[in-house]
UniProtKB/Swiss-Prot annotation:
Species: Caenorhabditis elegans
Domain of life: Eukaryota
Pathways involved: Protein modification; protein glycosylation
A family per Pfam: OST48_N
Name used for this protein in its record: Dolichyl-diphosphooligosaccharide--protein glycosyltransferase 48 kDa subunit
Record topology, Lumenal segments: 21-405
Main location: endoplasmic reticulum
UniProt topology in membrane: Single-pass type I membrane protein
Length: 445
């Protein structure tokens, strides 16, 4: 039996590894392990299994026998033109449709492959060779003179702590690369980091002067989206944003208010990857219950109109690898047939949200519907279908107070009919004496 503890240890290790998320990291060369080692190690330290490959590796694949081989895909290969193996932009779209999450980091030397991936998801990178330039917010130490190494302030970040972390404490972020724009019809697009109002996209090596294609805050430095199946994708125009150089650098902006501060690239990269890998902003429904007021279980025969009901739902949020009660106070319940007949905000008591209300005086098939959509969170959707019936004849009130005048008129009519009948049937007329004398005289004649 000496082998039993060892066997249990091996089994526990295998079980732990099976729970770890599998990440495929693609670089232009194997050098990405060195140039981005701090970033990759930070992801590995959070319990993920990383597989680093060249983007043109002939053995690349995301599916095997119809199943996902990896849970997440990081592309740190800006200049890739064609992926190796079975990998392609359409294959990556299938990966997202299957629930996989993607991080794409481009650069000024962007290739066609990354441009196609962005187009598949409602974004468009600028032309190859262009860079985002800002003459008022660049780093004086790292910049080569083109003013393309930008210092990004906290006011340029999206107001979503789940995605970018605590922006109030975040140091300026260094960015060098290409800009992108979100499609006008892309309703799912998130403008995670915008360029400043003085920035523009241009080719710094262009000999002939032309107007910038995009400028100002319309230029995105980092964009993303959460698809309808809750898969997450992040696009950035700077692979250097995740590099060791930018992680360890101190900002030396032309703006004196942000000089000398340690760059916030490491904290920003941690926050953005935690979000895209669904380590944060994930909700789930634990339990749902609805019943008549004063009872504890749903009625077998369904509900009846105008009954008082209580609806309760328990929601949990994933934080630091553990499911904890969700503390949101803006979750709403709708009681829907075709349109909502009732809409009420649920009261949160440490993750247990509830509301009591009266059913409408309308019969039919209804749904208890919770449809919670907030930036940074996964889409929470729960439906409980119930029937609402009319009252049985024995359930109606014997006398309705509002009908008392009609009751009174009915009873008064019946009483009047009885009195009239008595008078008519039992009243006898008294004969007139004069009439009898006249009758006797007529007989004599």
């Amino acid at each position: 039996m000496r082998w039993l503890p060892g066997l249990l240890l091996i089994a526990s290790i295998g079980f732990h590894q099976s729970l770890a998320d599998r990440v495929l990291v693609l670089g232009e060369t194997a050098a990405v392990k060195d140039t981005h080692s701090v970033f990759l190690n930070s992801v590995k330290e959070r319990g993920h299994e990383l597989t680093v490959r060249a983007a043109d590796d002939s053995q690349l694949a995301l599916f095997k026998h119809g199943q996902l081989i990896f849970d997440h895909l990081f592309i740190l290969a800006p200049g890739v033109q064609v992926f190796g193996g079975s990998l392609s932009p359409s294959e990556i779209s299938k990966f997202v449709d299957a629930g996989g999450n993607v991080l794409v980091a481009a650069g000024s030397n962007i290739g066609d492959a990354l441009r196609e991936i962005a187009a598949e998801h409602g974004f468009e990178f600028e032309e190859a060779g262009t860079s985002v330039i800002d003459h008022h917010n660049y780093d004086q130490t790292l910049d080569s003179g083109d003013h393309t190494t930008l210092v990004v302030g906290k006011d340029q970040l999206i107001s979503a702590e789940l995605i970018v972390g605590n922006s109030a404490k975040l140091h300026p972020v260094l960015f060098k690369g290409i800009g992108l724009v979100a499609g006008k019809t892309n309703n799912l697009a998130l403008s995670i980091v915008r360029a400043s109002g003085t920035a523009y996209s241009y080719d710094p090596k262009a000999v002939r002067a032309t107007n910038p294609s995009i400028a100002g805050s319309r230029t995105l430095l980092v964009g993303g989206l959460q698809s309808r199946n809750n898969a997450r994708i992040v696009f950035t125009g700077s692979s250097e944003l995740f590099s060791n150089t930018f992680f360890s650098a101190k900002t030396n902006s032309v703006n004196p208010s942000v000089q000398g501060a340690q760059s916030g690239n490491a904290d920003f990269a941690t926050a953005i990857t935690r979000w895209v890998m669904k380590e944060s902003g994930v909700l789930r429904v634990k339990t749902v219950n609805h019943h008549k007021k004063g009872e504890t279980v749903p009625p077998v025969e369904g509900y009846f109109i105008t009954e008082d009901v209580v609806y309760t739902i328990e929601i949990e949020e994933l934080k630091n690898g553990k499911w904890v009660p969700f503390q949101g106070k803006d979750v709403q319940l709708e009681f829907v047939r075709i349109d909502p007949f009732v809409r009420a905000t649920l009261k949160n008591s440490n993750g247990r949200l509830s509301v009591a209300f009266k059913l409408p005086d309308v019969l039919g098939v209804f749904k208890f519907l919770v449809d919670y959509r907030r930036v940074g969170y996964t889409h929470l959707y729960d439906v409980q279908q119930v029937s609402v019936r009319p009252l049985w004849h024995t359930q109606y009130e014997r006398f309705i107070r509002s009908a008392y005048p009609y009751y009174a008129s009915s009873f008064s009519m019946m009483a009047g009919l009885v009195l009239f009948s008595i008078v008519y049937l039992y009243h006898k007329d008294t004969p007139v004496k004069g009439a009898k004398v006249l009758d006797s005289e007529k007989k004599k004649n």
